Amino acid sequence: MRAIISLLLISAMVFSMIEAVPLEEGLQLFEGERGCLPRNKFCNPSSGPRCCSGLTCKELNIWASKCL
């Protein structure tokens, strides 16, 4: 019985820590991960076929194979 209560308390503590980060901040962190990589001017591979235009990512068209 004590083990179950301890497990519930630990679960509640972990959940409250996860909820401590606001959703908007979490989304901003995720968007930042998809930003431009400075060393090769390409976006993160997880963002798909995109390249950098300034500091933002743009879609590559069928004729473009690299960023200019």
UniProtKB/Swiss-Prot annotation:
Q: List the disulfide bonds.
A: C36-C52, C43-C57, C51-C67
Sorted alphabetically, which keywords does the UniProt record give? Disulfide bond, Knottin, Neurotoxin, Secreted, Signal, Toxin
Q: Does the keyword Lipid biosynthesis apply?
A: no
Record's subcellular location: Secreted
Q: Which domain of life is it from?
A: Eukaryota
Q: Does the keyword Transmembrane apply?
A: no
| Tissue specificity annotation | Expressed by the venom gland.
Instruction: From the UniProt record, list the residues forming the propeptide.
Output: 21-34
- Kindly state one GO CC term assigned in the UniProt record: extracellular region
Q: Where is the signal peptide?
A: 1-20
Give the GO molecular function terms.
Answer: toxin activity
Report the domain remarks. Answer: The presence of a 'disulfide through disulfide knot' structurally defines this protein as a knottin.
Summary of the function given for this chain in its UniProt record? Insect active toxin causing rapid but reversible paralysis in crickets. No activity shown in mammals. Does not show effect on mammalian voltage-gated calcium channels.
Instruction: Give the UniProt family note.
Output: Belongs to the neurotoxin 01 (U2-agtx) family.
Please state what the protein is called: U2-agatoxin-Ao1x
Source organism per entry reads Agelena orientalis (Funnel-web spider)
